[in-house]
C-alpha cells in the first residue's frame, strides 16, 4: 500500500478526542485552482486558540466530528478534508480572526447551491467553541461554476429582448403591497407603465392571498402590459411573483405566465429555497422568461457583522442558482448598504472577472468565465432627488426601482412614472455630455424640472426626505 493510500485501518485505530488543529490546521498547504476557498470571520470562545477555532470550522464543515471514528480508516482524509490554511487578525478587534479554509471540489455535488451551503454553513455555526462566526466570502473555481447554468439569460440578452440600451432600466413596486383587488392592482400597473417605466413589480409577499388570487392578478397585469405597450411603443413587463408553498405550484404559476406571453416572472429565492430557485431558472431559460429575484429574509442572515453570512456570498450563490435581476441595496435610500462594499458585490454580480480587493470586501479573485451576469436592482426609499447618485453609482447595467417614489406622486401614478423617467433621461444625458453627477446632480434635476411639471411636483414633495443612519456593516 502506497503512503498516499495508507489509512488508519492499515496502521491501527486509536480512539479518543484530539485537537482539531492537529489534523485540520495546515499552514503549509498550497491551495489548488480547483479548491473552493472560504473566508470566515471567527470569534472564538475565551481560551480557544485561533488555530483551533479555524481548524474546528474546517473540520465541522467537511469531514470532521468531535471524536476520532473507526470509519476514518476506510477513506483518505487527506483527499477529502477541509483545511484551515491561514489565519489573520481582524484590525481593531482583539479576539476576532479571519480564517481561510480550502475545500476539495469532490466534497460538493455538481450544480447544487443547496449542497454547497449545507456543507459549508449547514452545521458549524452552532459550534460551542465559537462565540460567533460569519462567512465573509467564497471563491468559486471555474471547475465548479461551470456545472451551473447560472442566470436564465443575463444582461445582454435581456437588453436585446427589451430593445433598451444605454441607460438603467426603471421599475416600480406596486403599493400598498397587500390589500388591493386584482383589477385595481392591474390599473396601477398600467398607469405606471404608460407613464414611462420599463417594469412594475409584485412585492415579495404578494403570492395568492384571499384578497387577490394569483391567477386573477396575472391576467389583469398582462392586460395592463399589453395596453401600455400599445400606447407607448415600448416593451413593458411586470414581475409576476411565482413564489408558492410548493415547487409544483410555483411551476404552475410560471407556466401560466408564459402562456400569457409576459416577459418576466419573479421569485423570492431565500424564502423559496435554492432548489426551487434553480428549478425555476432552468424553466425560464428553456421558455424565454426573464427571472427577477427578490432577497426577502436576507437581513436575517447578513446584517450582523459578527455572525451569519455576508450578502456577497448570497449574491454569488444566486448567480450560480440563476436569476436575471436581484435586489442589491441602494447606498442612498432607506435600506442598508455601504458604498464600497455594495459596489463590490454589484461587480461580483455583473462582471466576468473580479480582482481581490479587501477595501471593497472582496477576499478572493473571482473568475466567472462565461457565466452571464445579473442586473443589480436598487430599491427602497428612493425618489427623484436620488436619481443622479443612483445613475452615477450603479451605471447603465442596473434597475432603479421606485415604489413610493412613483406611487406617492401628488398627481397620481402615471405622473409619478413620468417624473422618474424624465429625471433618469436628464441624468443620462448630462453624464454623456461629461457633467459630474456627483457634484452637479441636483442642478441637473432642477433644470429638467423646468420642462416637466410632473418632475417639478415630485421635487417639491420629496425635497426634505432623507434617511440618515450609519451603516452597521463595515469592513
Swiss-Prot record:
Binds 1 Mg(2+) ion per subunit. Mg(2+) binds at residues 201, 203-204. Its main location: plastid. The record marks 334 as: Transition state stabilizer. RuBisCO catalyzes two reactions: the carboxylation of D-ribulose 1,5-bisphosphate, the primary event in carbon dioxide fixation, as well as the oxidative fragmentation of the pentose substrate in the photorespiration process. Both reactions occur simultaneously and in competition at the same active site. Heterohexadecamer of 8 large chains and 8 small chains; disulfide-linked. The disulfide link is formed within the large subunit homodimers. This is Ribulose bisphosphate carboxylase large chain. The gene is rbcL.
Amino acid at each position: 500500500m502506497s503512503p498516499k493510500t495508507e489509512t488508519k485501518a492499515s496502521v491501527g485505530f486509536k480512539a479518543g478526542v484530539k485537537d482539531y488543529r492537529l489534523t485540520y490546521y495546515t499552514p503549509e498547504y498550497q491551495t489548488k485552482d480547483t479548491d473552493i476557498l472560504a473566508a470566515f470571520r471567527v470569534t472564538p470562545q475565551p481560551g480557544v486558540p485561533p488555530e483551533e477555532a479555524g481548524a474546528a470550522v474546517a473540520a465541522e464543515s467537511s469531514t470532521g466530528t468531535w471524536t476520532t471514528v473507526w470509519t476514518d480508516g476506510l477513506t483518505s482524509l487527506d483527499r477529502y478534508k477541509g483545511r484551515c490554511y491561514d489565519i489573520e487578525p481582524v484590525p481593531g478587534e482583539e479576539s476576532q480572526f479571519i480564517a481561510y479554509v480550502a475545500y476539495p471540489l469532490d466534497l460538493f455535488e455538481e450544480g447544487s447551491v443547496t449542497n454547497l451551503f449545507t456543507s459549508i454553513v449547514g452545521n458549524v455555526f452552532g459550534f460551542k467553541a465559537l462565540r460567533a462566526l460569519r462567512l465573509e466570502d467564497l471563491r468559486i473555481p471555474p471547475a465548479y461554476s461551470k456545472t451551473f447554468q447560472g442566470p436564465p439569460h443575463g444582461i445582454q440578452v435581456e437588453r436585446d429582448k427589451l430593445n433598451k440600451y444605454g441607460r438603467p432600466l426603471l421599475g416600480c413596486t406596486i403599493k400598498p403591497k397587500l390589500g388591493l383587488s386584482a383589477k385595481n392592482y392591474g390599473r396601477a400597473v398600467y398607469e405606471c407603465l404608460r407613464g414611462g417605466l420599463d417594469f412594475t413589480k409584485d412585492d415579495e409577499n404578494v403570492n395568492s392571498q384571499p384578497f387577490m388570487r394569483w391567477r386573477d392578478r396575472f391576467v389583469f397585469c398582462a392586460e395592463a402590459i399589453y395596453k401600455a405597450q400599445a400606447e407607448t411603443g415600448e416593451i413593458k413587463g411586470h414581475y409576476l411573483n411565482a413564489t408558492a408553498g410548493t415547487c409544483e405550484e410555483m411551476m404552475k404559476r410560471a407556466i401560466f405566465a408564459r402562456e400569457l406571453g409576459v416577459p418576466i416572472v419573479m421569485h423570492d429565492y431565500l424564502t423559496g429555497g435554492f432548489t426551487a430557485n434553480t428549478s425555476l431558472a432552468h424553466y425560464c431559460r428553456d421558455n424565454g422568461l426573464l427571472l427577477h429575484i427578490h432577497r426577502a429574509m436576507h437581513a436575517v442572515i447578513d446584517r450582523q457583522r459578527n455572525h451569519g453570512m455576508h450578502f456577497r456570498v448570497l449574491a454569488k450563490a444566486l448567480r450560480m442558482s440563476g436569476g436575471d435581476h436581484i435586489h442589491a441595496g441602494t447606498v442612498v435610500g432607506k435600506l442598508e448598504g455601504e458604498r464600497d462594499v455594495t459596489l463590490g458585490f454589484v461587480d461580483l454580480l455583473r462582471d466576468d472577472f473580479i480582482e481581490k480587493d479587501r477595501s471593497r470586501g472582496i477576499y478572493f479573485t473571482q473568475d466567472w468565465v462565461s457565466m452571464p451576469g445579473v442586473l443589480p436592482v436598487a430599491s427602497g426609499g428612493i425618489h427623484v432627488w436620488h436619481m443622479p447618485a443612483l445613475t452615477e453609482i450603479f451605471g447603465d447595467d442596473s434597475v432603479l426601482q421606485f415604489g413610493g417614489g412613483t406611487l406617492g406622486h401628488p398627481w397620481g401614478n402615471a405622473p409619478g412614472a413620468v417624473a422618474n423617467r424624465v429625471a433618469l433621461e436628464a441624468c443620462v444625458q448630462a453624464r454623456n455630455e461629461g457633467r459630474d453627477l456627483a457634484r452637479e446632480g441636483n442642478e441637473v434635476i432642477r433644470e429638467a424640472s423646468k420642462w416637466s411639471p410632473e418632475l417639478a411636483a415630485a421635487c417639491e414633495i420629496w425635497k426634505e426626505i432623507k434617511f440618515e443612519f450609519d451603516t452597521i456593516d463595515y469592513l
